[in-house]
């Protein structure tokens, strides 16, 4: 019974680590996408400001 229990515990630890790794990877990817979206939005705002300034002159 002891080797079986040990095997179950080791399997659980390995699966838990895989889950944590995949969750952290998706979280980092999400943060990267959000940062890119903010950058893209900021660039669009800057372009609109530049275009409106150009029209005024």
From Swiss-Prot:
User: How is this protein annotated for GO cellular component?
Assistant: host cell membrane; membrane
- Grouped into one coarse class, the protein's main location is host cell
UniProt entry keywords in alphabetical sequence: Host membrane, Membrane, Transmembrane, Transmembrane helix
Its transmembrane ranges are 3-23
Compartments where found: Host membrane
Region entry Disordered, spans: 38-57
Q: How does it sit in the membrane?
A: Single-pass membrane protein
What is the name of this protein? Uncharacterized protein ORF57
Species of origin reads Acidianus bottle-shaped virus (isolate Italy/Pozzuoli)
């Amino acid at each position: 019974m002891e080797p079986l229990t040990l095997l179950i515990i080791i399997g659980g630890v390995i699966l838990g680590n895989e889950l944590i790794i995949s969750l952290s990877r998706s979280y980092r990817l999400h943060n990267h996408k959000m940062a890119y979206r903010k950058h893209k939005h900021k660039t669009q705002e800057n372009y609109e400001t530049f275009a409106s300034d150009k029209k005024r002159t």
